[in-house]
């Protein structure tokens, strides 16, 4: 199973990715992990990436695609792989297609923006213990304080509504077009095109997992 998981920040991709990878015995590949591993291993592509990063630049799509091709030839990808957060843009998707990277499925987890904002902006945490709460879905016994210590809970900057809205705007502008790109390619009937499936990301984790498994076939 070679697949791409698409969805906005906070759509629950991480939870589903972990489940799919365990079930199929495939690695979850993110560009960040891939870059770090290649730099550490000192591969040709890794050294090229390090040079750019050390200079404070953005690693080019050419280098990223080179790393992808290198990574999916490794033994742990024999049964497939799951791309998490990649490709991010149409040029990356086009470059992957041109490089002949074979895909079986593009799976989109669809959650309305307002539901994501509610989901993320409602998170609260107790920094010392790592305990997490949600003002609506998993509230503490006493509003604003940790159940165990009685210490105040905090809202991470990443979870503030304004930040969440900005991240969603970036997703809509950059990554959302990939949904149209892959669904249009699948509709052409091209033998090289991956299947495209969309599942609803609202409900319990178990319900969403069941939908994901049905889509994976």
Swiss-Prot record:
AMP binds at residues 31, 36, 57-59, 85-88, 92, 156, 167. GO terms for molecular function: adenylate kinase activity; ATP binding. Belongs to the adenylate kinase family. InterPro entries: Adenyl_kin_sub, Adenylat/UMP-CMP_kin, Adenylat_kinase_CS, Adenylate_kinase_lid-dom, P-loop_NTPase. The keyword Hydrolase does not apply. This is Adenylate kinase. HAMAP family: Adenylate_kinase_Adk. It comes from Leptothrix cholodnii (strain ATCC 51168 / LMG 8142 / SP-6) (Leptothrix discophora (strain SP-6)). Pathway: Purine metabolism; AMP biosynthesis via salvage pathway; AMP from ADP: step 1/1. Consists of three domains, a large central CORE domain and two small peripheral domains, NMPbind and LID, which undergo movements during catalysis. The LID domain closes over the site of phosphoryl transfer upon ATP binding. Assembling and dissambling the active center during each catalytic cycle provides an effective means to prevent ATP hydrolysis. Monomer. ATP binds at residues 10-15, 123, 132-133, 203. Residues 30-59 are annotated as: NMP. Keywords: ATP-binding, Cytoplasm, Kinase, Nucleotide biosynthesis, Nucleotide-binding, Transferase. It is an enzyme of class 2 (transferase). It is found in: Cytoplasm. The keyword Kinase applies. It catalyses: AMP + ATP = 2 ADP. GO terms for biological process: AMP salvage. CDD domains: ADK. Catalyzes the reversible transfer of the terminal phosphate group between ATP and AMP. Plays an important role in cellular energy homeostasis and in adenine nucleotide metabolism. GO terms for cellular component: cytoplasm. Its EC number is 2.7.4.3.
